[in-house]
């Protein structure tokens, strides 16, 4: 029985993870669950899956959670310390990191320090702290298994292959809802437009990231750390059908690709069962209904966030942390309709240009840079409105 902690159990990855766990009650159990502020769903999950403990990140909601779980023999914690505590406890074997954004960094660090294997869906953790995280994986002998569909695809294509035979990896991107829009129309993009993803059902932050193609940019940086490749060996192609999840090109010119219906339960299950594969009755590809698979070069003039991510990755150091913090704030402001869609990339670019490039050798350094960048972007956005 593999005992599983889910950091972010009420989000898209978390709810899909619980669905996978429910299909294999003899193999998996949910030991600890956490949520940001969705206290009602967390309580429902706790009553259904009977974990040992739950964490609500929003400390002001702890009282409500206690009321909802009154009479239940479930430990209740709150805040970042609660999240870190369930990440390192000895009575869990595997941690699924699906907390959105920078908030996922510290609990992932705690899980790795405690020698836990991690299924990583929180790409920001590697974007911000790639060098620190990969060092911890090596130091503590942990496995870090990708849960993102694209990185899971690359991981699967690399099974049985020697690293020296890899030429490059090719991450596929749906292109989002604005793939066919002219740049001149981008000024008119509304929040509702941007949340209307053509292929995947995801949380609001990652859906906006997909619309700007920042999601793919973050995945490029994540791939650099997961697969130890330079940026000139990480390509992105737009694939509107989201059937080919990613590819690996080898030195002899041959290419391996991993295909499947766009269903996050499949890569989640693979991370949980690796190196085995369990039967599951998920939807299968119907080859009779696939008339063609399209591939395009991404337009980085329209989608500047992808180019900014490559720039931050190549500069290295603390630039990816700045990229991530600026993006998180810009997306938050866009979702609140305080800035326009085009302002997202503008604010990220401004923050990167303003950054002094100082090194970040510890988690505390990264926290300081993250906080400074967030203040800068909030101030810059306020100045936009003042004009």
From Swiss-Prot:
This protein's superkingdom? Answer: Bacteria
Provide the binding site for Mn(2+).
Answer: 148, 150, 219
Where, by residue number, does NADPH bind?
10-13, 36, 38, 122, 124, 203
Names of required cofactors? Mg(2+); Mn(2+)
A Pfam match: DXPR_C
Which parts of the sequence bind 1-deoxy-D-xylulose 5-phosphate? 123, 149-150, 174, 197, 210, 215-216, 219
Q: Which GO terms describe its molecular function?
A: 1-deoxy-D-xylulose-5-phosphate reductoisomerase activity; manganese ion binding; NADPH binding
E.C. numbers: 1.1.1.267
* This protein's name: 1-deoxy-D-xylulose 5-phosphate reductoisomerase
User: In which organism is this protein found?
Assistant: Chloroherpeton thalassium (strain ATCC 35110 / GB-78)
Gene this protein is translated from: dxr
